[in-house]
Amino acid sequence: LPGFWKDADRQEYFHLYEVTAKAVKEVDERLLVGGPAICGVDDVSWLQDFLDYVKEKKLPLDFVSRHHYTSYVPDRVGHYGYIDLHDPDDAFSGLEKSREIVDSYEEFAGKDIHITEYNTSYIPNAPVHDTCYNAAYVAHMLSRLGDCHTSYSYWTFGDVFEELGVPFTPFHGGFGLVANGCIPKPTFWTFAFFKKLKEKKIHRSEDSLITKQKDGSYYGVIWNPDNDGKGEKKEVTYTIHLPENYERQEYCNLVKIVDEEHGNPLKVWHD
């Protein structure tokens, strides 16, 4: 907290919420207020203390907010921060704990939780952001974030980040889905693919999500991140089984791929 406000502490932050929430509601009761925007540092203690404060002071709380980043402390070398990511399943344990804490309060049980920022790394100069690995890892996140959260906002759409100014090079590990110059990075296509997943979910696993549309067509996303960091090639196979009574006619299986050779502008830039 002192990184944002001089001599700030937890109680001062809660007091800031108190005066802000009251001011907002005085203007219009219909405006929603919430917090505390925890961000992966001592989350349990922060969230419990915040809810205790709101309960004791009888403050308005329409929703709970938090951030979600899944990297360890970066190894800073030159302009960049190189990071390792948590195991995808382990990364969700903190989110599930937040839901559990909120629901443990009678006053707040069932409150909406909004993830107002999420990404792999929390720094705007992590090379992982520009990679296919990031795209595959985020696909796993997208497949599950909606289970316990009302909304979740990827941080950020573009690489021009106001805190650090205009990027010094097209690919510098920025947060964005698109690099400077509106170049779509691999993770951009993760969102483009997930946009197609509508109507009825018929399958979800640790590496895939399949939906059936009203017109009878199927859309799916399959991801294959190299979570062990060894860079070894891992094959992905899938099989489509048609029922015996399926109408005999022509069918089309359209596949779009993002990997080191496809949809990867970073490699083109390096080459």
Where are these regions (language model features)?
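Alpha-helix capping/termination and helix-coil
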Residues: 102, 106, 149, 195-202, ...
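Catalytic cores of secreted or luminal carbohydrate-active enzymes
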Residues: 142, 156, 168-205
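Noncatalytic carbohydrate-binding groove/subsite architecture in carbohydrate-active enzymes
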Residues: 9-150, 170
